Swiss-Prot record:
This is Uncharacterized protein HHLF3. It comes from Human cytomegalovirus (strain AD169) (HHV-5). Residues 67-87 are annotated as: Disordered. Residues 70-85 have a biased composition (Basic and acidic residues).
Length: 137
């Protein structure tokens, strides 16, 4: 796993809906990263947790895009919290500041970031920045 800083691509909301934001580029070189989502039972941190591990993409950006579009069909941007527990809770990858760590936790349905282990969200909620630290769960 490359431990360099990874920057999410700038996106409009429409682009995010289409693509769900799963494509990342390293800033200096246009090298693609695959974002692998693993889901943890709710009730762990504030009831909602997703572990995201960033690995170098072997399959190529086209596969990542297809995979992310399938994800997006299953889980919409807004998931009401009173719904019964879904088998997958998807987080918007643009919702937090990416740090150069291979694994980190992002939480919190109310949008308050929580530091956990090596990862702490970089920007407070509501700042006008592409790296906003809220979770869409």
């Amino acid at each position: 796993v490359h431990r360099r800083r990874i920057a999410p691509r700038r996106c409009s909301e429409a682009k995010c809906r289409r693509r769900f934001g799963f494509m990342f580029q390293r800033s200096a070189k246009s090298r693609w990263f695959d974002v692998v989502l693993t889901f943890v039972p709710s009730g762990f941190v504030m009831g909602h947790v997703a572990i995201i591990s960033v690995t170098t993409d072997v399959l190529g950006p086209r596969h990542v895009k297809r995979k992310s579009e399938r994800q997006h069909q299953r889980v919409h941007h807004e998931l009401p919290h009173d719904k019964p527990r879904q088998s997958q809770r998807v987080m918007h990858p643009h919702a937090f500041g990416m740090r150069a760590v291979s694994q980190f936790l992002v939480t919190h349905p109310l949008g308050e970031p929580e530091a956990h282990g090596a990862f702490a969200p970089e920007t407070p909620v509501g700042t006008r920045s592409p790296l906003r630290s809220y979770a869409i769960l």
